[in-house]
Amino acid sequence: MKKIITLIFTFICALSLSAQELDTTIFILDEIVISSFYQSSTTTSSVVSPQDLNEINYGQEPSHVFSKMPSIISLNDNGTEYGYGYYRIRGLDQTRINVTLDGCPWNEAEDYGSYFANSPDLMSSMKTIRVERGAGSSYNGVAGVAGGIMLESINIFDQNNDSYAYLSAGSYFTNKVTGVYNMKPHNGWGLHIKATNQYTNGYKDYGFNSSQAFTIKTGYKFNERHTIDFLSMNGFHRNGQGWLGNTLEELELNPRANGNVESETDNWFMSMNRLQYKMWATDYLLISSSVYFQFQDGSYRFDLDNYMKRMYGDYTPYNMLYDYGLRHHMIGANFIEKCYLSDLTLTVGVNGYTYSRDHFLDNKSFNIPVEEYYSNRGTKTDVSSFAMLQYNPFRSVMVSGNIQYRYSAFDYIDFVNENNSFNRSDNGTEWNFCNFGFNADYTPINSTKIYAKFNHINREPTRSDMFGGNENFTGEFATLNPEIANDIEFGVEYTLGNKVYTNVNFYHMWFKNELILNGEYGLNGLPCHDNALESYRNGIEVDVKWRIVSSLNFDVNASYSSNKCTTETFGKTNHILTPAVTANADLYWNNKGFNVGFNTNYHSKMFIDMSNEYSIPYLWTLNFHSSYRYQKFEFSMRINNLTNRVNYSMGTLNDIGQILYFRNAGTNFVASVKYVF
């Protein structure tokens, strides 16, 4: 392992010394987006721009912004867009989606979750958000089997950043207060400070969310070639849980019923910090280096009687309330160089981190026998290196290839029962992966681009999968193999001036040992997975943006897919929670500070069990949005689900053949006012 890292750094240093200097214009560091280090120009992605972020951000969980993009759906716990939100790209859940913040890993490294609820009002501190669909082989951190989400924090050296106060209120006692201060760059210094408090009762009974956030980003710009900045994002949130559904009979009696009980709450604090230095070493060589630290502490409560009642019907009362404690920290660093050599662009980089998470159950729980107490620690080590070479033989042609080596290992310490402890070599929890990809673009005319790409990626099982959904190791591993994903994409982009943009993308993803949902949940509340013998996901995605006249716009996207898997028990069936059709449309008018429009969101029915006997119906909403700018004020109003349609974001099947539904809110609104200083 040490030899590999040494060779990588030797190669990077040699590259810096041997490259020929080019007579080029000095690039402005403010314009360098870190995500551009990790991708070629061939992408199947959607970008939320700074203007979009300003217009659509009202404190909602980012998952619900992603759901307006092709092939993406969002789910929620409490029936609203606040609190816990989840998202799936092409039917693949967020543990298969790589998330980075300024190139630094965001996912927690044991179960690969990426919970934006831990960082309330995240979007108020972002410059852009890029969502890439399809397997990616050059991400930092966990494997991006389904795609990647690249968060780019606000540019503190931008003269156009506004300081403002924001206040909103809406249905279910939803409210948000935010203050943002953006200092105009002064003597090389930049500063961004944000403080937010938001609350909602939630649509579900006692499905509340109470969140606070504080973010600071500051840095110094030495000149046009050198910048350094520090970012600290901190969030605290408390929730009434809602991860258990209800039967239709319960929802007919009380549409706002919650499958969880009132005593099942959680408390979390999360802090994400990073220090980043960027420089143009020469006119052709760009370097970025970062160190980062992530910390989270909290617990969630679990009522065993309620769980047994909902999932199994008949049960023996235990009168137990578990309080599962979790505390983790992650420390890491990355280093990237991008070198421009005439028709070639070479990018190389290294990322590594160590992650430790403590799991504990103690006397904060109620009526739990002392012998059930546990305390253990999982430690994850992850080191990866990658190289990407892009070649432009002609102005109209681009080809590129990338390769990544990734080493991952998991160790476990049981502080109560030492016999259950193990290291990475004891149980095969050490993996060496080689991921790679190829891309090609052809632009026959300025308005048209034809592209194709292929990626091959490997992913190891999560801790929860290996432990069978238990919070502590019981001595037996679930027999799961790493999954292998292959993804071929082909598409065409067409642009007609500033009037029309169209993208049509075809994809074929096939897997070996894909870890698919089996419809069951562990005692830790996380869904369980099994290896499929074989599986695939094929589809077409269409994205169109049309400026009908100067002030009237129409955006529409849709996808159609076939998603199959083969298992020993059920044979060939459809994937769970994977709709065959998704569609979104937005018709809006924007003129002289006034914006008004209607948008709609749809996805087809989804199966919730491996036998495909049970499903939840299609989802469709019609929404209204408007805003008006007057001098330093901006007023906005959003009304969701205008038709008051009954929608279910997801469902699960219990052991006695009942579907437990997660019902979304009916017609609801949020209104806001923003004052720019």
Walk through the language-model features, giving the residues of each.
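N-terminal periplasmic "start-of-domain" segments of outer-membrane beta-barrel proteins
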Residues: 26-59, 86
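Short acidic/polar hinge/loop motifs at secondary-structure boundaries
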Residues: 88, 105-133
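A beta-strand signature from Gram-negative outer-membrane beta-barrel systems
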Residues: 120-164
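Transmembrane beta-barrel wall of Gram-negative outer-membrane proteins
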Residues: 169-199, 204-240, 265-285, 293, ...
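Face-selective signature of the C-terminal outer-membrane beta-barrel domain
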Residues: 225-229, 233, 267-419, 432, ...
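Surface-exposed extracellular loop regions of Gram-negative outer-membrane beta-barrel proteins
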Residues: 238-255, 358, 363, 407-422, ...
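C-terminal beta-signal and adjacent terminal beta-strands/loops
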Residues: 458, 511-512, 554, 602-609, ...
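Gram-negative outer-membrane beta-barrel transporters
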Residues: 503-511, 528-610, 672-676
